[in-house]
UniProtKB/Swiss-Prot annotation:
A single MF term (Gene Ontology): zinc ion binding
Similarity-based family: Belongs to the alpha-carbonic anhydrase family.
TM regions (residue ranges): none
Source taxonomy: Eukaryota, Metazoa, Spiralia, Lophotrochozoa, Mollusca
Gene3D superfamilies named in the record: Alpha carbonic anhydrase
Biological function: Acts as a negative regulator for calcification in the shells of mollusks. May function both as a calcium concentrator and as a carbonic anhydrase required for production of carbonate ions, which are assembled to CaCO(3) at mineralization sites. Is important for shell formation in both the calcitic prismatic layer and the aragonitic nacreous layer.
Entry binding sites for Zn(2+): H149, H151, H174
Annotated spans, Disordered: 218-329
Record protein name field: Nacrein
Positions with biased composition (Low complexity): 237-321
Subunit (UniProt): Homooligomer; disulfide-linked. May also be disulfide-linked to insoluble organic matrix.
Gene Ontology cellular component list: cytoplasm; extracellular region
PTM comment, free text: N-glycosylated.
Chief subcellular location: secreted
Length: 447
């Protein structure tokens, strides 16, 4: 994004928090690379628009971003760098953390997406499109939607930037909000420990994305993609009627989900995807594949352990992480899946473009498509940084506990986007920064 230079001066006489300069994902892009091809030719620059890459052979990789430019020094010596591994049982419950909402609610936005070379393509709202994040008491109401982008990894299973208890998902979506430059920061009533003074320029909502095959329909053809990208979707509401059920993919007590007697992620579903009880059903005895939970915090064997995070014995209780009240249900994001499939496959996004030669693809989307249903928006929050240079430490992270599922085709299409001049795609190096080792306090909105 664009932002005010937040001075974070270290022992060296160097202020390394730059938020007012321009960079991908977080800054409005002017110049992304010194030569437009994605190559950093000179190291130890002072420019904040110096190029960076996930490929160490043409530009220092994530572990050495701080050596590219003095402006990037926070990437190496910062105290609140992101992403992090979130340890769920160490996170502190804060009773007054607000619900995550948006204003206006379920607003469909006109966005433009382009090829961003070795970065994740991002969906940026067109001028005049306004959407604000609502986190009453935690931040003021002036954080405006800046973009949606999705990170992937070098492997299909490890693509998220954050992890929970050491576990990753294939992708992670980021909804980036930036404080409106036209307004002053208003004091908030809920403080996160007060370890870091000043204000956060950004609120970034992180969503763990899983992938699946069932229930997403056939791959859309080019003609169908034209309608999808303009915001026209079939009438099958994501929270309405499901594939084979009376009450939809996410129906609380739907009679028939994808393969079971009750909804795909039904709170009391008898049959989830392949198990005796819902995939993440609040009272489901079994996770992904029968007796074995998906990611049991205290499960005997993790992915295939006896007790999944939302299985019989979650982190602290018999039902879900802390019992029925705060269990999860994986939303199957059908509309978002088809939008991402069509966008990533389109030549304007898929093919490598030099700076100045980008072609924007118009896409209509609702950012809330990427989020769990409102009643399942339990989250972890902490004060961190941008995950790309300059790694500015001015971000309030809101990382969703509950996952969202998209089609496997989305992952395939994203990994096949060309990120380099020679045609190398994003599958080779990924677009994720490794988790950082610094100690930050993480809070959570659920017990």
């Amino acid at each position: 994004m664009y932002l005010h230079l937040t001075a974070l001066c270290v022992v060296i006489p160097l202020c390394y928090g730059a938020s007012m300069f321009k960079h991908d994902h977080y800054m409005d892009n002017g110049v992304r690379y010194p030569n437009g091809d994605g190559i950093c030719k000179q190291l130890n620059e002072t420019k904040c628009d110096a190029g960076f890459s996930y490929d160490r052979s043409i530009c220092e990789g994530p572990h050495y971003w701080h050596t590219i430019s003095k402006c990037f020094i926070a990437c190496g010596i910062g105290q609140r760098q992101s992403p992090i591994n979130i340890v769920s049982y160490d996170a502190k419950f804060r009773q007054r953390l607000p619900k995550l909402k948006f204003k206006p609610h379920m607003e469909k936005l006109k966005t433009e997406v382009t090829n961003h070379q070795n970065r994740a393509p991002e969906f940026e709202p067109e001028d005049g499109e306004n959407l604000y994040v609502k986190l009453n008491n935690l931040v003021d109401g002036h954080y405006k939607f800046h973009n949606l982008h999705v990170h992937n990894g070098r492997t299909r299973r490890k693509g998220s930037e954050h992890s929970v208890n050491g576990r990753f998902t294939p992708m992670e979506a980021h909804l980036v909000f930036h404080h409106d430059d036209q307004t002053h920061f208003e004091p908030t009533r809920t403080k996160l420990g007060g370890a870091f003074p000043g204000h956060n320029d950004f609120v970034v909502v992180g969503v763990f994305l899983e992938v699946g095959d069932d229930g997403f329909g056939d791959e859309p053809d080019d003609e169908e993609c034209k309608h999808i990208l303009k915001g026209h979707h079939p009438d099958n509401n994501e929270n309405g009627n499901g594939d084979n059920g009376n009450n939809g993919y996410n129906g609380d007590n739907g009679n028939n989900g994808d393969n079971g007697n009750n909804s795909y992620n039904g709170d009391n579903g008898n049959n989830g995807v392949n198990g005796n009880n819902g995939y993440n059903g609040d009272n489901g005895n079994n996770g992904d594949n029968g007796n074995n939970g998906y990611n049991g915090d205290n499960g005997n064997n993790g992915d295939n352990g006896n007790n999944g995070e939302n299985g019989n014995n979650g982190e602290n209780g018999n039902n879900g992480e802390n019992g029925h009240k705060h269990g999860c249900r994986v939303k199957k994001a059908k509309h978002l899946s088809r939008i991402l499939e069509c966008a990533y496959r389109n030549d304007k996004v898929r093919e490598f473009k030099k700076v100045g030669e980008e072609e924007g693809l118009d896409v209509h989307l609702t950012p809330e498509m990427a989020l769990p249903p409102l009643k399942y928006r339990h989250y972890y929050t902490y004060e961190g940084s941008l995950t790309t240079p300059p790694c500015t430490e001015s971000v309030l992270w809101v990382v969703q506990k509950c996952h969202v599922q998209v089609s496997r085709r989305v992952l395939h299409a994203l990994r096949n986007v060309e990120g380099y001049k020679d045609g190398t795609t994003l599958r080779k190096y990924g677009t994720r920064r490794p988790t950082q080792k610094n100690k930050v306090t993480v809070y959570k909105s659920f017990k």
